[in-house]
Amino acid sequence: MPSVLVIDDDLFVLATVGDVLRSAGYTVLTVQSPAEAFHLDLSGISAILCDYNMPEMNGSDVLVAMRELQECRAPFIFLTGHSDLDDLIPVAIRYGAELLPKPVDPTELTRLLRRQLAA
């Protein structure tokens, strides 16, 4: 069963996304900050969903750190309510990440995650 790490500073988003993914059959690990995520063993993580706008660091920085410093190659999906994506799109393209707008549509979330895991 694939394991998904969800990083978001909003407890409601963590609970909602976690419930959707568990209902779809995924094992879910949720953390409220990038610092918590960086202390995890990411080797068993199948995919990462990460909020873009967090106080500690933004999602682009999290993605770069995971790819370059932690050598984590799991598919990465940005969750964002941010309307100005000019700084996010180049990073997403460079690292092959996807974007999913908030509020998260459960059907779109599971479809996108299945597609990422199949790639």
Feature map (PLM): residue ranges:
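C-terminal output helix
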Residues: 95, 104-113
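Charged docking surfaces used in two-component/phosphorelay signaling
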Residues: 15-19, 23
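His-Asp phosphorelay/catalytic-motif detector in bacterial-type signaling
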Residues: 44, 70-76
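Receiver (REC) domain active-site loop signature in two-component systems and cognate sites
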Residues: 54
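Active-site residues of response regulator receiver
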Residues: 51, 80
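Acidic, metal-coordinating helix/loop segments flanking the phosphotransfer/catalytic sites
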Residues: 30-47
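Short acidic/polar segment at the start of the alpha1 helix of CheY-like receiver
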Residues: 10-14
